[in-house]
Amino acid sequence: MEEGGGGVRSLVPGGPVLLVLCGLLEASGGGRALPQLSDDIPFRVNWPGTEFSLPTTGVLYKEDNYVIMTTAHKEKYKCILPLVTSGDEEEEKDYKGPNPRELLEPLFKQSSCSYRIESYWTYEVCHGKHIRQYHEEKETGQKINIHEYYLGNMLAKNLLFEKEREAEEKEKSNEIPTKNIEGQMTPYYPVGMGNGTPCSLKQNRPRSSTVMYICHPESKHEILSVAEVTTCEYEVVILTPLLCSHPKYRFRASPVNDIFCQSLPGSPFKPLTLRQLEQQEEILRVPFRRNKEEDLQSTKEERFPAIHKPIAIGSQPVLTVGTTHISKLTDDQLIKEFLSGSYCFHGGVGWWKYEFCYGKHVHQYHEDKDSGKTSVVVGTWNQEEHIEWAKKNTARAYHLQDDGTQTVRMVSHFYGNGDICDITDKPRQVTVKLKCKESDSPHAVTVYMLEPHSCQYILGVESPVICKILDTADENGLLSLPN
């Protein structure tokens, strides 16, 4: 590697282009190692050719701040690097204000609570006191039944102090914990809560949670997310403006920094191998063509939410929505294999994943590289049981079109005889709702699960594949190959 007189800043891969660059280029001469790579700062590589002028505004560049890179084909490039500096370092060093616990103290003293309403559960975080998830049901006579779990409270002082002591030690050593929030590594202050409702899946040990407070100047202490990261252990992310006065907890935008790689005499403006890779990507990027049916205005029917968040219910996650992609089989072959049960849909984000094999079973599972696969049979298919169920329930739901015709918008199937439930001592059972979902990706499928009652589930499956077979449903909602 050859250096300019001003030295070399860190060369950081901030995206696919830079990852490709690192694979294509190698430093030449000098015998020194490249700077250490990190993902903290994103970069973008530009290939301006032999002649160009450095930007005079924005990030600062110097002509002598460069590296000479050589490809496997002996193509040479002079890559000029931006002078990336952190203007917050001095402010952090000089900060003498309150620590994060002291900044959050007004919130804890106010006895205030924050709420997040999901499709079934409501989450209540009373700051400095407890975390509760609950569901209210009104019965005949307006009697209200409350189904609730405490995910943690402040009675478990040992857990609380352990979390806070760890956070204080990290702050002193400048190791503030961070969490990936929408692609941005964001600093947070953790508050531990233990002594929650006993968890039957963990030998009745109490549930526990970590509340992660992150800075957001315009927030009002909202609950951003609730996730069950492992069985009966939760993470709750809270947005608060109170931490924003502390420089170490402020949200920092990461602007993309441009690197300019000039081609040296005898070299093309861009490496040959990189151009070949880009051409291959263009070939693979086949545009999706919408058919006439998909060009029609979308109906106003109720649509299941498509939120990528694992949400806990009872001792298990109950609303987990995720999008997966089916291999590019031909549509006819894919439908045939789906209806035969040989092609299964998989989905879910978080601890639990779901497998649905049409006419066979619904499984809930978790895979761990150390302990292997944990699987729960949620329901198995029996056509006679389903037909009996269909006599008392709606197996085929219609949508009325503007021209007065009816089309099938959803079918529901009953799968019973699952594994015995610890709470009810009865077999688990699930109602599978198959619904058409228009998408720019014709092979996408969304799978999610609800648990409105203990061990009685609803599995939602939405896909463009289902659009092609819904109208074949008979009076019992059973599907067949289209003509």
Swiss-Prot record:
Q: Carbohydrate attachment sites?
A: 195
* GO molecular function term, any single one: unfolded protein binding
InterPro entries attached to this UniProt entry: Man6P_isomerase_rcpt-bd_dom_sf (IPR009011), MRH_dom (IPR044865), OS-9-like (IPR045149), OS9-like_dom (IPR012913)
Q: Does the keyword Metal-binding apply?
A: no
| Recorded superkingdom | Eukaryota
Subcellular localization, as worded in the UniProt entry? Endoplasmic reticulum lumen
Q: What is the documented function of this protein?
A: Probable lectin that binds selectively to improperly folded lumenal proteins. May function in endoplasmic reticulum quality control and endoplasmic reticulum-associated degradation (ERAD) of both non-glycosylated proteins and glycoproteins.
Question: What quaternary structure, including any partners, is listed in this protein's UniProt entry?
Answer: May form a complex with OS9, HSPA5, SYVN1, and SEL1L with which it interacts directly. Interacts (via PRKCSH 2 domain) with KREMEN2 (when glycosylated). Interacts with HSPA5.
UniProt protein name: Endoplasmic reticulum lectin 1
Q: State the gene name recorded for this protein.
A: ERLEC1
